[in-house]
A protein has these predicted regions:
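Catalytic-core regions of glycoside hydrolase
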Residues: 210-211, 230, 254, 258, ...
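Feature activates predominantly on carbohydrate-active enzymes
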Residues: 183-310, 316-320, 350, 354
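Beta-strand-rich ligand-recognition modules
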Residues: 28-58, 62-66, 72-74, 80, ...
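Boundary at the C-terminal end of the N-terminal hydrophobic targeting segment
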Residues: 20-25
Length: 589
């Protein structure tokens, strides 16, 4: 049966939209490429897509330019230590493997009969001799050395991926380009136990809330312990009078100078006790200057006293960790004044408990600290803020990568120990969810940062456990972190039955999160809306758009069936998106 153009486009979009189906230490690669990145070969004859991989293929020598593929890539600095070419490839289905050659800058890394399997992709590594890799431009060639054959017929050799990396590197799927979740056949301990004598990557590992209620904190404490986390900080919005002023930005809810209601204090005292019961360090925090009609005055002792009373209350409960946040403010951005307030609160805390710790969230809390406004501000904190006070830092940007280079630069300027405030999987109370694994955090930043703290969803704290579990996995053992493995284990650890795990897998794939997209969308990014907009923006897409809506509707029905008493805000988010897509569909078609 011949398929019409419309059906072909529909199938292509359905494939794009609906396809779904023990970690070792893995250093960062020097370079990574898809097979399709190689020039030459037979990709101009037969395309580059095969079994979800971007491939290139070489045929026997008589095929001329189709018998070899080459890749040119730059190297700024050749690292010390042995390096290897890691290939993900497959052989043809002929009776024997074909002969190939692998050359780097003209020097042979391998020549002879390849040992890759026919029919399925496998990986092998080839040692790079000393001196073969050079600074500047390098050329890697993969050639078929068979003397007889023609294009389109065996013998042939097909490459899906190529990486230059140390021996222990493992070729893994690039989740930025191809995100889907494979549920593991085995439920493993999670995070995996560390080898004897090895300490966790980050000493302190946890999350904060996001305008959470006491009930939300209490619900998450056992999960933090389950995932080997040991730190929980209240969101300063939780200390606002949200019960009477739900619009926290209207300068009525932040009443830091007033006593907290007794009922609220009792609720948070229970949160502290539950943390202590589960081995979780509770960190108490406030932000007196955000959306505030009355900012704290460093020159008025009575003003500092009004702020101090809240910290004194918590210290009386046995709390040892405290936070003053001065992020996202528009007034009072004076590093000297901020340091003066923080130093005074810290002095009072240490006077009562020599083990008390304070973390200041500075107004400039992201980037490498070299900006025109950031650097003098941070240099003032370096001089005037007590050296024992930690600083929160969100990474290279408010949302995005966290690199060792930016960490070292920021730390050298601010002059203080750092605690990573990782802005993932936070949605800032916007109608979306970010459910994929945490990505793009350098594996060695734990060497210079003591603590890791995730930032969560607002209302959807139950589904937040899935991405938070991957954060816990990363923070526990960064060197062995595999996001594809981690997200699968996270799902099977929060759901009991195969049907429950499958529906959560599909929900995660629908809302993979802002970090999966390499452009690093903001916290309000909605993958469902974005996917649908791309579908209806393509030609011949009406059937695909209908299928996508139907898929999401079935997902909603399954979620309600499998979890009748859970994930209520999550269900509402999904249902609202479905209705929005239906409205867009009606307008377009």
């Amino acid at each position: 049966m011949r398929l019409g153009t419309t059906c072909l486009h529909t199938l292509l979009w359905l494939t794009l939209v609906l396809s779904a189906a023990a970690a070792d230490a893995t250093p960062e690669p020097l370079a990574h490429f898809a097979g399709a990145d190689f020039q030459g070969g037979a990709k101009d004859l037969y395309g580059t897509a095969y079994e979800g991989e971007q491939v290139n293929t070489v045929y026997a020598e008589p095929t001329g330019p189709h018998s070899a593929m080459q890749l040119k890539f730059p190297v700024k600095r050749v690292p010390a230590g042995p390096l290897f070419v890691h290939l993900k490839a497959r052989d043809d289905d002929a009776p024997r493997q074909c002969k190939i050659a692998l050359l780097l800058n003209g020097q042979a890394l391998f020549e002879g009969t390849n040992e890759f399997k026919p029919g399925s992709f496998t990986t092998r590594k080839f040692a790079i001799p000393d001196g073969a890799l050079k600074e500047g431009e390098n050329t890697l060639v993969i050639a078929c050395r068979e003397k007889n054959g023609r294009a389109g017929q065996p013998p042939w050799f097909q490459v899906a991926a190529c990486t230059i990396a140390p021996a222990q590197y493992i070729l893994r799927r690039d989740l930025h380009k191809d995100f889907w979740v494979k549920l593991p056949a085995e439920v493993r301990p999670f995070p995996e136990p560390l080898p004897p004598g090895k300490a966790p990557g980050f000493k302190f590992r946890g999350t904060k809330g996001w305008a959470w209620t006491p009930e939300q904190y209490l619900a998450e404490i056992p999960w933090l312990a389950k995932f080997k986390m040991n730190f929980l900080m209240n969101c300063y919005l939780s200390m606002f009078d949200l019960e009477n002023h739900p619009n926290w930005g209207a300068k009525e809810a932040n009443r830091w100078w007033e006593d907290l209601p007794e009922a609220k204090k009792k609720s948070y005292e229970q949160v502290v006790r539950e943390c202590q019961k589960h081995g979780i360090l509770f960190c108490f925090g406030m932000n007196p200057n955000i959306a505030s009609k009355r900012m704290v005055n460093d020159n008025a002792p009575e003003s500092v006293d009004l702020l101090w009373k809240h910290y004194a209350w918590m210290q009386g409960l046995g709390v040892k960790w405290f936070n003053i946040s001065l992020d996202d403010i528009t007034e009072g951005i004076n590093a000297s004044s901020q340091a003066k307030v923080a130093n005074e609160i810290f002095r009072r805390l240490r006077a009562k408990d020599s083990e008390a710790q304070l973390i200041l969230c500075p107004t400039f809390y992201s980037g490498d600290g070299t900006g025109e406004k950031q650097k003098p501000y941070l240099e003032t904190l370096a001089r005037e803020l007590d050296r024992d006070i930690y600083l929160f830092w969100t990474g290279d940007a408010v949302v995005g990568k966290v690199t060792r280079k930016a960490t070292d630069t920021f730390r050298s300027i601010c002059g203080h120990r750092l605690f990573l405030w990782d802005n993932y999987p936070v949605n800032d109370n916007r109608p979306t969810m970010h459910l994929g694994p945490v990505l793009d955090r350098d594996l060695d930043i734990c060497e210079v940062i003591d603590g890791y703290m995730g930032n969560p969803h607002c209302k959807q704290n139950e589904i937040n456990r899935i991405p938070l579990a991957t954060c816990a996995d990363y923070a526990w053992n960064p060197a062995d972190y595999d996001p594809a493995r981690s997200i699968g284990q996270a799902i099977v650890h929060v759901a009991d039955t195969p049907a429950q795990r499958e529906v959560l897998r599909d929900l995660v794939e629908a809302y993979p999160g802002m970090l999966v997209y390499t452009s690093y969308r903001g916290t309000g990014f909605n993958a469902v809306q974005d996917q649908f907009d791309r579908i209806i923006g393509a030609p011949y897409s009406r059937q695909a758009a209908m299928a996508y809506i139907e898929h999401l509707q079935k997902l909603s029905d399954r979620l309600k069936q499998q979890f009748p008493d859970h994930y209520q805000p999550e269900k509402q988010t999904l249902d609202n998106d479905i209705q929005s897509l239906k409205n867009k569909f009606a307008v377009k078609y």
